[in-house]
Amino acid sequence: IGTLKRSDIRRYYNRLIDERNLKIATVDNIHTVLHQIIDLAVEDGYLRTNISDNALKELKQTRNLFTEKRMALTVPEQELFVEFLSKSPMYQHWFPIFSLMLGTGLRVGEATGLRWEDIDFENNTISVNHILVYFNHSKGGCYFGINSPKTRAGERTVPMIESVREALMQEKENQRLAGITCDVRVDGYTDFVFVNRFGNVQHQGTLNKALRRIIRDCNEEVLDKAKDNKPVVLLP
């Protein structure tokens, strides 16, 4: 490993795309794992620096693979989103996790990977120290895993505002009333905050599908109530 160079990493990523036809999202997952491994090599003195730093960014630059910049919701859009979720009988059970993500800025894997021990209700803080990921291997099957944040800045303590605190308390009460408990252990981690009715962790794909349906139905409701072609706020 001591003979590896930055060019070796770039060549490896290019080979994954050109010869194995992997998508950039898959290469991104591989980069996450590889970066952590090389970090360990640096700590043990086999390498002076992490030669995979910025390798994925450079790959995207050379192949023009940067996706369109995502825009944050405006305040009116946020208010519409929260109000619709809180009042919708069909989607109300999604309110706690989306409210938490909106009020903290946590990514999907950070939110779905939260454990109750990461929540400090006394000091109103949330510890973000790991990411829940989902691996899909043709030979090994599909399974969840736990990764460390991609950078040291990713490991952080987030203040818990009142709306997030209320959402978490609502989630705890909803699970108590429904008799739902966390019945899964992922890489030694358990007691996850957000679990489905089977006691398993939430899948990112499930959240994405739910979000698309929420946006569709919310916008349809707004348009149905609109009068005289007046401008309305819609979810993007």
What is each PLM-predicted segment?
Residues 39-48, 170-173:
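Arg/Lys-rich amphipathic alpha helix in sigma70-family domain 2
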